[in-house]
C-alpha cells in the first residue's frame, strides 16, 4: 500500500493499537499527527521513531471530552502538516462495573471519550475536508463489542454500538463529498490494557478456546487493516465494519 502524500491524525496514538497504526501509516509513506491526553513522553517517542522513517510527525495534546480542545486539535493538525486527509478515531477507554453500580461519572468517562469525542473529532475533520473541497477517509477503531455482549462493560458496549450506527449514517451523508468512513472491530488484542488477563492463565486459556485461530491478535494485525482503509485501494469501501478477531465473533460464548 502506498500512502505517500497522505496526512493522518491518529487519536490516542501514543500507545497500544494507536501507536501501531501511527507507525504503519508512516512506514507506508504518510505524515502523522499523534494525539494524546497524558504521558507526553510516549507521544514524543512515537514522533521520534516516525521521523526516523523520513516522515513528518507532530504530537498534540487534547482532551477529547471537550469540543473546544477537539477544534484546537484539528486546527493545529492542519497547521502542522498543511492539512489532514485521514482520520483514525482510536482513542478509547473502558470501565468494568455491574450495570446497577455504574455511576454517572463512570458513564460519562466512557461515553465522552468513545462516542462524544469520536463524533466531534469526525465533525471537525469533515468540516476541514469540506472547506478544502477534497475527499477524506475516516477509520474508527471500534470493537467486536459493537455486536457482541460484554457483561459488566455495558457503557463500553453502548459506546461502540453508537459508533457503529454513527459510521453507518455518515457513510451515506458523507459519500457525496467523497469522504468514506469505516469501522475496524478488533477482538482480543495483546496490548498493555490486557496485562491482567495475560497474567491469568485460567482466564487466558478460556479466552483462547473461543478464538479459532488460537492466539491473541497483535496490534500489527489491526494496523495493517487501518493502512488498507487509509489507502486508495479502499476507495469503494464505506459503511463497513472489518472484524479483526481471529474468528472470535462466530465462535463466541461468554465465560
Residue ranges and their predicted role:
Residues 122, 159, 167:
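Active-site helix of classical SDR
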Residues 14-15:
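Conserved glycine-rich cofactor-binding loop
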Residues 98-99, 103-111, 207:
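Substrate-binding pocket helix/loop in short-chain dehydrogenase/reductase
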Residues 127, 172-176, 235:
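Alpha-helical segment proximal to the catalytic Tyr-Lys
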Residues 143:
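Residue(s) in the substrate-gating loop at a strand-loop-helix junction
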Residues 148, 227, 238-255:
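Short C-terminal tail/terminal secondary-structure segment
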Amino acid at each position: 500500500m502506498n500512502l505517500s502524500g497522505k496526512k493522518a491524525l491518529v487519536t490516542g496514538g501514543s500507545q497500544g493499537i494507536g501507536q501501531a497504526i501511527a507507525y504503519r501509516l508512516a512506514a507506508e509513506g504518510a505524515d502523522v499527527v499523534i494525539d494524546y491526553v497524558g504521558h507526553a513522553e510516549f507521544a514524543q517517542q512515537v514522533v521520534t521513531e516516525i521521523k526516523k522513517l523520513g516522515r513528518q510527525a507532530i504530537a498534540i495534546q487534547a482532551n477529547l471530552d471537550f469540543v473546544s480542545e477537539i477544534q484546537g486539535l484539528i486546527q493545529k493538525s492542519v497547521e502542522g502538516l498543511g492539512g489532514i486527509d485521514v482520520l483514525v478515531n482510536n482513542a478509547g477507554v473502558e470501565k468494568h462495573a455491574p450495570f446497577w453500580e455504574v455511576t454517572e461519572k463512570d458513564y460519562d468517562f466512557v461515553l465522552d471519550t468513545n462516542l462524544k469525542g469520536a463524533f466531534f473529532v469526525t465533525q471537525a475533520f469533515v468540516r476541514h475536508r469540506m472547506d478544502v473541497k477534497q475527499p477524506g477517509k475516516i477509520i474508527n477503531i471500534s470493537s467486536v463489542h459493537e455486536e457482541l455482549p460484554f457483561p459488566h462493560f455495558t457503557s463500553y458496549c453502548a459506546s461502540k454500538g453508537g459508533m457503529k450506527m454513527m459510521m453507518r449514517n455518515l457513510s451515506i451523508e458523507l459519500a457525496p463529498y467523497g469522504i468514506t468512513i469505516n469501522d475496524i472491530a478488533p477482538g482480543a488484542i495483546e496490548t498493555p490494557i490486557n496485562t491482567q488477563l495475560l497474567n491469568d492463565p485460567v482466564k487466558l486459556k478460556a479466552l483462547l478456546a473461543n478464538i479459532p485461530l488460537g492466539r491473541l491478535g497483535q496490534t500489527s494485525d489491526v494496523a495493517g487493516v487501518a493502512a488498507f482503509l487509509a489507502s486508495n485501494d479502499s476507495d469503494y469501501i464505506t459503511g463497513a465494519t472489518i472484524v479483526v478477531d481471529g474468528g472470535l465473533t462466530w465462535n463466541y460464548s461468554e465465560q
